[in-house]
Structures are given as structure tokens and as C-alpha cells.
């Protein structure tokens, strides 16, 4: 642990000394960057050299003379020049003479020259005469100008040769095949009739069995002609029924048009089915009413009589009022008479209570009738329109309704006036809440009357949407009226009035207050309001009593009809619902289909039927005549014809076995263009780029990156010393091995910086195409560590000799590392040393990250580099303490020459 700690102290000491010295800092930064410049300049220079081959001048001159072929003048040289002018792969320079071409190539003005001799076209067409002579392209190249240029220009000449060869093969093969086409089409044209006859004979022979069946059917049909004529006559009779069918079709269409209305009406049976329990309950209620109707009549008669008795008492009191007023001066008489009137009023209280109850019940019934009126209006606007007749009916209904509201309000006002008079007579306020309820009820009825008037205006204007909205508002008012009537306590009102009258009687009986009280009571007003209230109740009851016999008979009839037929009604509703659910949809579908047929297809079918029968009637004589002739042919001539067909078919089949003219014609008629194209280029190359790299510069990056890392290590070892400068005291404190590892750490740190700078500069600065940038940086760091350790150990152990060894390894790596060219094209020596050079594996590792990593190869290179690093570290750690003094002595001997430092 102490050794490691000392090593870190020495490592830190190195960097403190560097950063304290500006010159040293500058040199270290320069050493980190300068090796990268070496790589970047080379990569950029080689970025895409083949993209600029159009700037490579190549002289072209054609001395070719035109040649004749089949009365056509052909000049291949001119065609070549035209094509080259369209070709921008090389810098073609079209000169005016052979001498200018040769001079330009010799002087280096042009890298190469291409010359087409004067007999080029003639020699190319020599195959047509049989005296074949291959044409020549004269290619001149100046190889001293550049090492790569001859290869590029040679490729251009080869491409030109291939192009001319392809054009020649294409033209020759196309001409030959077009001639074959002409021959093939001529044969085909002359064989059309033969093929048709041959096919007809063979087909007929193959189907003789079928033809025999048809001939027999013709004979049978001929025998059935009388029966066919009879059926045709019956079909003609059917035409006379078409008008009836037309009428039936119109009825079907009309019925189908009304189907939505029918469907809507029939759907009510489902509602009835849901209401069966209510219908059965209604039957029970009607039966109970029918049985108890006599009691109802008796109760109503009794109520009317009680009301009349009360009214009679009130009338008696009213008749006594003049006498009471005359006796107003006599206190005793006044008290007696007034007390008597009050008692009579109290005795009439049951009649008054019944009157109030009847009035409220009438209003409650009226609110229920309101819902019926609104339902009638809602039903009328169900189809979103109102007829004039419907408007008139609704107007009459609403007018009667508004008049009824007025009567109800009058009755309520009489009750309110009566209650106010009763309270004023006693000076109490016990009936205030009831009076307020009745006043609110009157206000609601007034609002309802106003709304019904406005509703009538909307109905007359025919605005259906506003009518619907307004009906909802009216329903809300009716609900409020019904709720308010339900909340009025009639029995409580009766008790309150009784209490008030009792109090009044007691007060009048008191002699002390008799005179004063009697004078304050307005019996006349009280009696008038009471009389009016009771009279209204009597009128309502007598109206209902007059209708009782008819109502009784209607209830009795309804009871007999409903309860006597309840089972039948329920069964009928259920059966109707089942029919609507199950049978009616089928009927509706079938009726719709029939309606569609009569609307869309019937006219065409009718026309086809009549036209067909008309045509059949017209053609029947011709058909009969043709059948007679066919029957005669079959009976007399068909056996001989059949025998001739069989003989001809046998002869044709025999000839087809020996010669297949169809295949010959097919070969001669092949597409000349496609076939000549195939002969010109029978094979196509499909290129598959396994690890694509965008350009030449990116492909060269692994080589120059590895090279710059080795150069950086050598450059650092040349400028920096491997010896740690320490005082004599510190030399005793730190061992040589600790000094060795500390300085190696400093070298490696600088090497890592060099690796980061060059790889990041490649990617972000130059835009090098790298498939795996992260691994590219990681691999470069590993390579830098390995190279820096190797160079450091060599220099630390051997001094300047070690530097020389590092340079020798560098030279061998450039030639034997397989960086720019495949190692297989190098000499045997370089192929032999290639696997043992660390540079080889460094380049291979960087190539993996550039094009795409194949991990078996990558791991192999990583293992080699790690192993080399470990070996050199081990060698240095073992030998450095023993070699340092010897290395110093060798360096001192060299420095005595005053030439080496």
C-alpha cells in the first residue's frame, strides 16, 4: 500500500511541476493536439478522391472513317465520342489530332490518351463479310506523373472497351433476332388458317360424344314441338292478367308506404302489455265503484241537503238583519239578536266546510284535466305540424279551459272573502295562513290562464318547437297547483272557523262587551260571503248529481265489459304483443321486398316478359322450320360427317408428334430487344455491403488514428524524459520502481488525452462515418494505453536506443500493418510480421467500431493489446531498477559527442 501511495505522490508531483511552468504546460497541450493534426490532415486529404476523377484529364481523338452496312453508313467513332461527352466520370479532353494527343501525354498535360484508328468501324463490321479483323483502341499512359492515376485512367479505357463491345453485341444480336422475328411472324401469319382448321377438327373430334348427345336432344326437341306451341299459347293468355298484377303492385307499394304509421300504432300493444297489471287493477276499482255507487249517490244527496240547510240558515239570518239593525239602539235587544245570529252561523259550519272541500276537490280535478288538455296538444304536434282543423280544435279546448279557470278563481275568492269576514268579526288572525295559501293558489291559476292564452297564440302561429318548450313550463305550474291544493288542510280550516265563531258567541254573551262588540260586527258582509261560498258548493254538487245516472250506467257497463272479458282482453294483448314481436317484422320485411320489386324491377320484368313472348311468337315459325331442317340433317348426313372428322383428327395428331410448329414459331417470335440485352449482359452483379462506410476518408480513419497515437507516444518520449527528477533525499525516499510507475502514469494520461482529442475530432470535427462512436473512443483509449506503455518501457529501459526501436516499429507498422492495402498484396516479409505487430490489431479494432462490430474479432484484438500492455509493464517493472544506471551511462557516452542530448 505504501508503494502505491508513493507512486500517486510522484504522479501528482509531475503534474504540479507541469502546471507551475507555463512553457511545460504549453508543450504538454501541444503534445496532446499535434498527433491529431497528423491524422486529421491525412483523413481529410483522402476523404473522397474518386469523387473528383472528372478533373483527371484524358485526351481522346477519333480518326475513324464511316463504313457501309446494308446500305447504311455507320461511324462507331462518332458514336463513341458522343457517349464520352455524356460521361463525366473522367475529364475527357477531345483533341483535334493524334499528334496533339501524343504530345499532351508526353508532356504530362494529360494523364492518358485514347485513340480510335481510321478503320475502327470497318474492322468492327468485318464479321459480316467473313474476313474478321478485331478493331483496336490505342491507349497511351504517362505512368511517371502519379502512382494511382494510371490505374484510374486504365479503368476508363477498359470501360470504353466494354462499352463498345456491349454496343456491338447488342446491335448484332438485335439485328439477328429481328430477322428471326420477321420469319416467325410470316410463318405465324400463314399458319393462322391451318391452326384454326386443325383446332376445329381436333376439338370437334374430342367432343363427338357431346355432339351426339346434342343431336339427340335436337331430335327430342323436334318431337316436343306440338307441346311447346301449346305452352306458348297459355303464356300468351297470361299477358291478359298483367293489368290486375299492376293494380296489386300499386296496393303493395301504398301499404308499404303506410308501414311506419302501422308500425307506430301496433307498437302500442307492447305498452298495453306492460299496463296489464294496471288494467287488472282498474277492473277491480271499477267493480268496487259499481258496487258502492248507491252509497256514493246517497252521500252526494246528503251533502247537497246539508249545504242547502246551511244556506237556509244563512238566509234566515240575512232576513233578520233589518230587525237587528232597528234594534241597534237597544243594547239588550241587540246582544240577544246578535248572539242568536252568531249561533245560527255556527250551526251552518258543516255546510260551509263541505263547500270549501268541494271547491278544493274541484280545483284538484281541474289540475288533472289540465294534464289531459296538454296531452291532446302534445299528440297533435307529434308530427311536427298543425293542420287548420287541429288549430281550431285546440283553440276551442283552450278557451273552455280558460273559462273554467275563471270559475275556479271566483270560487276561491268567495272562500277567501268569507274567511276574512269571519276573522274581522272576532279580530283574530287564525285563518291568515289558509288565506295566504288560497291567495297563492289564485295567483297560480291566474298565471296558468295567462300561459294558456300565450300557448293558444303559439298554436295559431304553428311554432311547434316553442309549443313543446312552453308545454313543459305549463306542466310545472300545474304541478305547483296540485301540490298547493294537497297542502291545504280542510278539516283544520273547519276547526279554526268553529273556534272563531265560538269565541265570537262567548264575547257577545258577555254583557260588558255586548254593545261594543255587536256594533263592530258586520254580519251583513259576513253572511253575504258565507252565502256565496255555500251557493257555489251547491251548484257544483247539483251539477255532478245531475250527471250521476249516466255516470252510474257507464261505470256499470264498463265493469261488465272489462271484468267480464278480462281474461280475453289479457290473452288478446299478449297474443298481439307476440305477433308484433315475432311475425310483424317478417311481414314488414317481405312487404318491403315486394314493394321494392314493384317499384324497381317489376317494370323491367314486365317489359322483358312481354318482349320475350312477342319475340317467341314471331320466331316460332322460324324455330320450327330450323328444327325440321336440323332433324333431317341428323337423320341423313351426320353419320358420314362424323366419320370424316375422325379420319382428319387421326392424321393431324400423327403429324404433331413428328413436328411442333408452335414451338418453332415461338422461338422465332421472341422479343428481340430483351434477348439482345440478355446476350449483351447475361450476368448481373448484386452488391451486398456487409459493413458499409460512407467514404474513403472514413475508411482510412482507423489506420491514421492508430498511426497518430503511436506517433504521439514517440513524440512524447522524444521531448519528455522518463527519469523523475528528485533530490538526493527524495531518491532515498522513493524507490526506482515507484518512480517508474509514476512517470508511466503521466505518459499514459497524456496518451489518453491524445486519444480523446483525435477520436472526438474525427467524429465531431471531420464528420467521419462511425457506426459505433462510443466504442470508437473506448477502443482508442485502450490502444493509446498499450502504445504509450510500449514506447515508455522501451525508452525507460534503453534510452535513445529505445526511441530508435519505437521508430523502427512505426516504420514496420506502416508497411506491415495492412492499414491502406490488404496485407495479402504486400511482400512475404510483411505478411510474416503482420500478426505480431500491435499496430495490426489496433487498426483492426478501430475498424470494428467504424463499420460495425463483429465481437469475436474485436475481443481478439482487445486481448492482444491488453496482453502486450501487461507484458511490457511486467518487463519494465522487473528490469527498470537494474537498467536505469546502465541506460544513464550509455546516454552519457552519447552526449560526449556533443550531438545527442
Curated annotation (Swiss-Prot):
InterPro entries on file: ABC2_TM, Phage_infect_YhgE_C, Phage_infect_YhgE_N, T7SS_ABC-Transporter
Disulfide bond residue pairs: none
GO molecular function, one term: ABC-type transporter activity
Domain ABC transmembrane type-2: 701-880
UniProt subcellular location: Cell membrane
Membrane topology of this protein: Multi-pass membrane protein
Protein name (record): Phage infection protein
Originating gene: pip
Amino acid at each position: 500500500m505504501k508503494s502505491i501511495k508513493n507512486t500517486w505522490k510522484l504522479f501528482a508531483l509531475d503534474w504540479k511541476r507541469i502546471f507551475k511552468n507555463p512553457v511545460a504546460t504549453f508543450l504538454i497541450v501541444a503534445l496532446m493536439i499535434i498527433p491529431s493534426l497528423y491524422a486529421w490532415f491525412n483523413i481529410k486529404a483522402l476523404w473522397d478522391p474518386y469523387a473528383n476523377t472528372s478533373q483527371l484529364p484524358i485526351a481522346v481523338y477519333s480518326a475513324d472513317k464511316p463504313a457501309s452496312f446494308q446500305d447504311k453508313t455507320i461511324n462507331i467513332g462518332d458514336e463513341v465520342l458522343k457517349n464520352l461527352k455524356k460521361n463525366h466520370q473522367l475529364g475527357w479532353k477531345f483533341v483535334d489530332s493524334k499528334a496533339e494527343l501524343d504530345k499532351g501525354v508526353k508532356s504530362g498535360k494529360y494523364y492518358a490518351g485514347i485513340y480510335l484508328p481510321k478503320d475502327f468501324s470497318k474492322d468492327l463490321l468485318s464479321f459480316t463479310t467473313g474476313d474478321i479483323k478485331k478493331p483496336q483502341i490505342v491507349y497511351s499512359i504517362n505512368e511517371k506523373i502519379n502512382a494511382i492515376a494510371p490505374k484510374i485512367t486504365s479503368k476508363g479505357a477498359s470501360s470504353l472497351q466494354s462499352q463498345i463491345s456491349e454496343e456491338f453485341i447488342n446491335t448484332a444480336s438485335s439485328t439477328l433476332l429481328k430477322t428471326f422475328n420477321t420469319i416467325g411472324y410470316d410463318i405465324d401469319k400463314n399458319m393462322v388458317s391451318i391452326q384454326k382448321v386443325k383446332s376445329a377438327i381436333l376439338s370437334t373430334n374430342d367432343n363427338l360424344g357431346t355432339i351426339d348427345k346434342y343431336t339427340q336432344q335436337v331430335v327430342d326437341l323436334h318431337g316436343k314441338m306440338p307441346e311447346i306451341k301449346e305452352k306458348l299459347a297459355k303464356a300468351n293468355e297470361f299477358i291478359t292478367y298483367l293489368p290486375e298484377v299492376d293494380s296489386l303492385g300499386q296496393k303493395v307499394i301504398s301499404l308499404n308506404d303506410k308501414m311506419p304509421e302501422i308500425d307506430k300504432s301496433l307498437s302500442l300493444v307492447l305498452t298495453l302489455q306492460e299496463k296489464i297489471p294496471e288494467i287488472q287493477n282498474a277492473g277491480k276499482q271499477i267493480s268496487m265503484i259499481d258496487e258502492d255507487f248507491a252509497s256514493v249517490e246517497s252521500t252526494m244527496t246528503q251533502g247537497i241537503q246539508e249545504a242547502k240547510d246551511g244556506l237556509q240558515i244563512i238566509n234566515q239570518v240575512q232576513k233578520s238583519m233589518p230587525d237587528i239593525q232597528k234594534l241597534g239602539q237597544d243594547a239588550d235587544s241587540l246582544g240577544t239578536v246578535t248572539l242568536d245570529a252568531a249561533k245560527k252561523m255556527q250551526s251552518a259550519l258543516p255546510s260551509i266546510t263541505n263547500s270549501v272541500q268541494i271547491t278544493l276537490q274541484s280545483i284538484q280535478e281541474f289540475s288533472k284535466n289540465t294534464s289531459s288538455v296538454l296531452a291532446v296538444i302534445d299528440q297533435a304536434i307529434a308530427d311536427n305540424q298543425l293542420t287548420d282543423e287541429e288549430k281550431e280544435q285546440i283553440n276551442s279546448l283552450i278557451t273552455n279551459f280558460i273559462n273554467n279557470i275563471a270559475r275556479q278563481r271566483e270560487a276561491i275568492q268567495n272562500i277567501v272573502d268569507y274567511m276574512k269576514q269571519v276573522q274581522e268579526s272576532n279580530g283574530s288572525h287564525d285563518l291568515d295562513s289558509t288565506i295566504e295559501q288560497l291567495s297563492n293558489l289564485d295567483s297560480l291559476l291566474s298565471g296558468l290562464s295567462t300561459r294558456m292564452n300565450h300557448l293558444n297564440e303559439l298554436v295559431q302561429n304553428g311554432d311547434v318547437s316553442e309549443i313543446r318548450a312552453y308545454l313543459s313550463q305549463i306542466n310545472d305550474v300545474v304541478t305547483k297547483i296540485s301540490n298547493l291544493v294537497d297542502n291545504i288542510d280542510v278539516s283544520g280550516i273547519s276547526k279554526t272557523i268553529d273556534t272563531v265563531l265560538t269565541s265570537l258567541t262567548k264575547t257577545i254573551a258577555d254583557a260588558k262587551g255586548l254593545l261594543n262588540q255587536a256594533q263592530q260586527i258586520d254580519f251583513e258582509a259576513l253572511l253575504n260571503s258565507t252565502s256565496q261560498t255555500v251557493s257555489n258548493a251547491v251548484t257544483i254538487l247539483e251539477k255532478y248529481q245531475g250527471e250521476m245516472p249516466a255516470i252510474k250506467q257507464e261505470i256499470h257497463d264498463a265493469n261488465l265489459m272489462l271484468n267480464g272479458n278480462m281474461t280475453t282482453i289479457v290473452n288478446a294483448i299478449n297474443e298481439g304483443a307476440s305477433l308484433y314481436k315475432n311475425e310483424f317484422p317478417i311481414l314488414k320485411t317481405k312487404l318491403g321486398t315486394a314493394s321494392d320489386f314493384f317499384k324497381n324491377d317489376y317494370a323491367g320484368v314486365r317489359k322483358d316478359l312481354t318482349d320475350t313472348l312477342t319475340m317467341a311468337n314471331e320466331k316460332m315459325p322460324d324455330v320450327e322450320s330450323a328444327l325440321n331442317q336440323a332433324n333431317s340433317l341428323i337423320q341423313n348426313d351426320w353419320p358420314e360427317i362424323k366419320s370424316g372428322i375422325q379420319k382428319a383428327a387421326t392424321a393431324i395428331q400423327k403429324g404433331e408428334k413428328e413436328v411442333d410448329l408452335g414451338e418453332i414459331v415461338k422461338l422465332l417470335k421472341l422479343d428481340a430487344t430483351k434477348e439482345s440485352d440478355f446476350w449483351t449482359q447475361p450476368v448481373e452483379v448484386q452488391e451486398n455491403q456487409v459493413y458499409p462506410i460512407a467514404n474513403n476518408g472514413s475508411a482510412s480513419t482507423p489506420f491514421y488514428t492508430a498511426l497518430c497515437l503511436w506517433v504521439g507516444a514517440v513524440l512524447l518520449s522524444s521531448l519528455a524524459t522518463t527519469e523523475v527528477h528528485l533530490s538526493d533525499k527524495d531518491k532515498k525516499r522513493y524507490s526506482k520502481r515507484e518512480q517508474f510507475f509514476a512517470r508511466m502514469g503521466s505518459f499514459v494520461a497524456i496518451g489518453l488525452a491524445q486519444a480523446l482529442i483525435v477520436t472526438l475530432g474525427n467524429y465531431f470535427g471531420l464528420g467521419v462515418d462511425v457506426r459505433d462512436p462510443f466504442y470508437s473512443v473506448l477502443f482508442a483509449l485502450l490502444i493509446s494505453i498499450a502504445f504509450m506503455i510500449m514506447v515508455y518501457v522501451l525508452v525507460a529501459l534503453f534510452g535513445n536506443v529505445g526511441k530508435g526501436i519505437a521508430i523502427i516499429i512505426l516504420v514496420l507498422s506502416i508497411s506491415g500493418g495492412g492499414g491502406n492495402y490488404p496485407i495479402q498484396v504486400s511482400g512475404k516479409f510483411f505478411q510474416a510480421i503482420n500478426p505480431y505487430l500491435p499496430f495490426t490489431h489496433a487498426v483492426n479494432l478501430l475498424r470494428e467500431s467504424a463499420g460495425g462490430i463483429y465481437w469475436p474479432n474485436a475481443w481478439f484484438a482487445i486481448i492482444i493489446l491488453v496482453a502486450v500492455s501487461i507484458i511490457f509493464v511486467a518487463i519494465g517493472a522487473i528490469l527498470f531498477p537494474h537498467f536505469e544506471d546502465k541506460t544513464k551511462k550509455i546516454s552519457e557516452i552519447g552526449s560526449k559527442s556533443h550531438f545527442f542530448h
